[in-house]
Amino acid sequence: RSEKGCRKEKNQNIQVFVRLRPLNQRERDLKSLGVVEVHNNKEVVVRISQQNSITKKFTFDRAFAPYANQVEVYQEVVSPLIEEVLAGYNCTVFAYGQTGTGKTHTMVGENTGDETTWQKDPLAGIIPRALSQLFDELRISNTEYTVRVSYLELYNEELFDLLATSEDNSKLRIYEDVTRKGSNIVNGLEEITVYNKKEVFRIMAQGQERKKVASTLMNAQSSRSHTVFTIVVHMKENSLPEGEELVKIGKLNLVDLAGSENISKAGSDNPAKRERARECVNINQSLLTLGRVITALVERHPHVPYRESKLTRILQESLGGRTKTSIIATISPGHKDLEETMSTLEYLTEQRTFRTSLRSTRKYKESYIERISEEIAD
């Protein structure tokens, strides 16, 4: 493939990918049949009837078979976005799908514990690999820079800071940014300056410790929340003529969406698990609103319902018009998950038509340059 991955057209602002995982031990124990296959690196073929071999085909920008490794997925889905971030654009990666299909494996992965490069590390997920690539590119560029990260959790429509330094786990509030149309601010959200990928793993581990996890019938350590890991890069060009200065601000949002499974599968028919049912309702409401927002953008409606969920308010700037987006859905091959797999694939098919205009967040601002320069010097 080209170094641009799949994103060959400059104006193709959203791309949709699917990653099919192998049958896991739970599915083998349940004698689950494999009913999903990947053909030609773009097509997902689902056998929807065991009796008469009826199949349905879905086509995406790229489909990854079970044998696809972490490096291959990253090179196609995320690596092309890093160039955009370094040029001062906003980019977003969503991981979407049913609980237990590999979203967290795809986004976070595992720490190999050695000094492997981002191009070769066999286990790292999208978040640490993206930061490794960013640092590599920044080190060889003729710019002064700072890299900051934040890690936000949305649980039952409440916002929590996964990197908060205090023991206070109070809820955060979100406000409209009056200085920038279509942007919101999460008041009090911690932003931490990072310098290398080792720090990133430490910070992510810190965030995971604070993260709310809950058992479901499908995954003993399933997350019942959305998480948003945001990387903001401030870059000051050094190669411009004397008297001219340019600050570029690039942003990469890495969003792990909570499991999209239905309430009955999550065990809510048991009265003791009503909290799980409440979680599912909130999760599905967030995902439904996200779909409605994207539909409104596709159809150019004058009103886009960002405010109908906290998730879409947080991501408003990432969906509105100054960003490139990759959606990677993870799916199970098992016939017992067929309903959820079909729901995921149909949801994704709707999103493929979404296109937005793209605007760089380059800024010529003397006072801002001075502030960033001071931070770089510190």
Swiss-Prot record:
Belongs to the TRAFAC class myosin-kinesin ATPase superfamily. Kinesin family. BimC subfamily. Testis and ovary. It comes from Bombyx mori. Its main location: cytoplasm. GO terms for molecular function: ATP binding; microtubule binding; plus-end-directed microtubule motor activity. This is Kinesin-like protein KLP2. May be related to mitotic segregation. InterPro entries: KIF11-like, KIF11-like_kin_motor_dom, Kinesin_motor_CS, Kinesin_motor_dom, Kinesin_motor_dom_sf, P-loop_NTPase. Keywords: ATP-binding, Cell cycle, Cell division, Cytoplasm, Cytoskeleton, Microtubule, Mitosis, Motor protein, Nucleotide-binding. One of its GO terms (cellular component) is spindle microtubule.
